[in-house]
């Protein structure tokens, strides 16, 4: 997509390896352990695949959109994604919005460490606010500084609220308090903002214990109540149902999306977003 040199490519791979070794944590507090050997193997394997044809592919000319409605994808690993292991909905939603003819700009302080293919001569907009393994409590502690750093935000896509908290064993009351506080802080940043908040898609059937299933069901009701109570004359808070119709076949592992899951979530977001886009 961009005119990468070998030096920039190697730098990117080093960042990815550090991310894998030190930071990556799948959603719901499940850690991935990577040895030094695995990291080294990953670097060598990736660099060995870097042929001149590959360079041509990633340096294909494309242009950013970066204008129009500013949309912040907010959440944890389901927002961040990690291609090759599991997918984010963002790339599929980005393509859907291009197909719809909308002008928009994904915003956030995080940028992907990997490349996505260009689409219709546009470069993928890789900015987001997805942080793997983070809880609503952690997001609540940081959302104000993130919003300040980004500046203008018109729409927030609030993914899987309370999901990681639940798997960390947090009390429902604490989850509710943190999600409410996040919404309050977003609206304080922009009193005219639109917030689209998920009724989260479930994990794999074999993974959903009785305790998780109960909390999952409770959170569906909680999200509806929060949206209703936080809506103002100038700020819409809209629920999007990601649970109905979501199946085990849409998961790459116990809780993360595969390609089909990412496309499903993107379509739900797209249909909810359209009335709020210029």
For each feature predicted by the language model, list its residue ranges:
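Substrate-gating cap/lid alpha-helix
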Residues: 202-241, 259-263
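Loop/turn elements at helix/coil->beta-strand transitions in domains of secreted/extracellular proteins
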Residues: 67-70, 100-105, 151-157, 190-196, ...
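Histidine-centered active-site loop/cap adjacent to the catalytic His
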Residues: 74, 252-278
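Bacterial N-terminal signal peptides
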Residues: 38-48
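Conserved SGNH/GDSL esterase-like catalytic core that processes O-acyl groups on lipids
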Residues: 78-177, 212, 217
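Bacterial Sec-dependent N-terminal signal peptides
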Residues: 46-69
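Active-site-proximal beta-strand/loop segments in catalytic clefts of secreted hydrolases
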Residues: 74-78, 107-112, 158-163, 198-203, ...
């Amino acid at each position: 997509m961009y005119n990468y040199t070998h030096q920039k490519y190697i730098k990117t791979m080093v960042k990815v390896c550090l991310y894998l070794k030190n930071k990556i944590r799948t959603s719901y507090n499940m850690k991935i352990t990577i040895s030094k050997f695995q990291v080294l193997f990953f670097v060598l394997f990736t660099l060995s695949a870097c042929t001149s044809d590959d360079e041509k592919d990633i340096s294909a000319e494309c242009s950013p959109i970066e204008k129009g409605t500013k949309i912040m994808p907010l959440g944890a690993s389901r927002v961040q994604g990690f291609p090759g292991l599991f997918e984010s909905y963002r790339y599929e939603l980005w393509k859907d919005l291009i197909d719809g003819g909308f002008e928009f700009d994904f915003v956030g302080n995080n940028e992907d460490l990997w490349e996505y293919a260009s689409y219709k001569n546009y470069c993928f907009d890789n900015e987001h606010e997805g942080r793997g393994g983070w809880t609503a409590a952690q997001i609540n502690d940081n959302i104000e500084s993130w919003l300040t750093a980004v500046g203008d935000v018109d729409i927030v896509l609030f993914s899987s609220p309370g999901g990681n908290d639940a798997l960390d064993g947090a009390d429902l009351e604490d989850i509710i308090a943190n999600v409410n506080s996040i919404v309050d802080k977003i609206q304080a940043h922009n009193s005219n903002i639109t917030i689209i908040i998920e009724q989260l898609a479930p994990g794999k059937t074999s993974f959903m214990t009785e305790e998780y299933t109960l909390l999952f069901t409770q959170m569906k009701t909680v999200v509806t109540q929060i949206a209703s109570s936080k809506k103002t004359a100038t700020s819409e808070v809209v629920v999007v149902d990601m649970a109905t119709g979501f199946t085990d076949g849409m998961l790459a592992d116990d809780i993360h999306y595969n390609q089909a899951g990412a496309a499903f979530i993107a379509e739900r977001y797209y249909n909810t977003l359209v009335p709020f886009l210029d």
